[in-house]
Swiss-Prot record:
Swiss-Prot/TrEMBL keywords: Cytoplasm, Nucleus, tRNA processing
Family in the record: Belongs to the ELP6 family.
Protein name: Elongator complex protein 6
Subunit structure: Component of the elongator complex which consists of ELP1, ELP2, ELP3, ELP4, ELP5 and ELP6.
Native species: Rattus norvegicus (Rat)
Length: 266
């Protein structure tokens, strides 16, 4: 995890909020560093994590995780991390017969709109065991990323319904958290992605949006991060609070600074 980002969000592994939906979105840049941050953050916070990874392999996340001080292999072996590797699983679903329903069963079904099997997998993974108390603090669902489901033929409404069920189960029933990444097509004529992004934005408690610099590439400033807190329980004037920073990605860290305050500029 990145300590500077924790400071901006006012969170620590020792003090994690529960019942929250966090939306990560990236526009014309790669926002995957946010996924790695929250994955390592919740593992260090001793949370039970179900990671639906539709973009990269387990080894990729594990290598980055080791740089951030966590071992995904060890977390998976002790039962703290349940990792659904979409790249590998999709091959199994498409080219091998399955005796039991697979979380990605929708890939073999006409219309590819039913995410019931994926929801059931998440529900069974995160629900507490019947015997004794759970050794983990709270359950967390992490998805990287939902836009891939649209590319696989699932409609935006179906994805929103799926996320609504996940939020009701993980956030409300189990008092856990959900974190999901969605690409922001930013003005492109992608109606389905816009529906998905807008729908999730209204449901989210926290939105982190990364975007490239309007001036183009800069070796000392890699992009801009906007943080929006949404508090539906507060009066209208206090419901939303936002901050914007620029950032530079390093090998094992990400540094954040106010606009125009990069060391290269100063």
């Amino acid at each position: 995890m990145f300590p500077e980002l924790n400071n901006l969000l006012s969170i620590t592994p020792d003090r994690t909020e529960q019942g929250k939906l966090t939306l990560l979105c990236d526009a014309k840049t790669d926002g995957s560093f946010l996924v790695h941050h929250f994955l390592s953050f919740y593992l260090k916070a001793n949370c039970k994590v179900c990671f639906v990874a539709l973009v990269q392999s387990f080894s990729h996340y594990n290598i980055v995780g080791q740089k951030l001080g966590v071992s995904l292999t060890a977390a998976r072996e002790r039962g703290q991390l349940v990792f659904l590797e979409g790249l590998k699983s999709s091959v199994e679903v498409l080219f091998h017969s399955q005796e039991e329903p697979h979380p990605l069963q929708f890939l073999r079904e006409a219309g590819a709109g039913n995410l019931q099997s994926l929801y059931t997998f998440i529900q069974d993974t995160l629900k507490p065991a019947d015997s004794g108390e759970s050794p983990w603090k709270c359950p967390v669902l992490l998805v990287d990323n939902l836009s891939v489901l649209l590319s696989l033929g699932v409609g935006a409404v179906a994805v929103l319904d799926f996320m609504q069920y996940c939020r009701a189960t993980v956030c409300c029933e189990l008092k856990g958290n959900v974190v999901a990444l969605v690409h922001d097509t930013e003005g492109a004529e992608d109606e389905e992605n816009n529906i998905l992004l807008n729908g999730l934005s209204h449901q989210s408690h926290l939105i982190l949006r990364t975007q490239g610099l309007a001036t183009g590439f800069c070796k000392d400033v890699h992009g801009q991060l906007s943080i929006l807190w949404r508090r539906s329980s507060q009066p209208t004037a206090q419901r939303a609070r936002s901050l914007t920073y620029q950032y530079k990605i390093q090998d094992k860290n990400v540094s954040f600074f106010a606009k125009g305050m990069s060391r290269a500029v100063l």
